[in-house]
Amino acid sequence: DVFYLGGTKCGALFGEAVVITNDDLKLDFRYCIKQHGGMLAKGRLLGEQFLALLDGEDGGETSLYFTMARHANEQALHIRAAFEAKGCKVLHDSPTNQQFFALPDEWYAKLAERYAMTHMDKPDKHHTAVRICTSWATKDETVEQLIEDVNAL
């Protein structure tokens, strides 16, 4: 019925696009946003970013947004495969640019010195739950270096 598209992972300056596919939910949605402080002045300019990002043929599959999102997702899944091959526990089955792992604390300590990852939780006294995100700007060399470092653990 409703989903959103994040803009920054695909090169937008900021913002998210809420997409409502259920016509019944569209009624007065604009007023709800305004009443709850979610509508920015000149906010339609944010929409221009999404129009440019989503411009493409084939229902958008060839658009800049999908091209960049595909890159981010593929990089994340490449990282996930390396962690899984090393025996690391995947916390959530995510097909997106965000991957969640329970790392042994010593792995986390070593990797956190070199890589940005979100510390999420301590699922037990020997592991740290982390989130690793990729984006449109994630370089192959960075992913390969991370994989080398994981394999060296």
Regions found by a protein language model. Give the residues of each.
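Hydrophobic alpha-helical segments
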Residues: 15, 20, 57, 118, ...
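Conserved C-terminal alpha-helix-loop-beta "cap" of PLP-dependent enzymes
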Residues: 77-78, 82-151
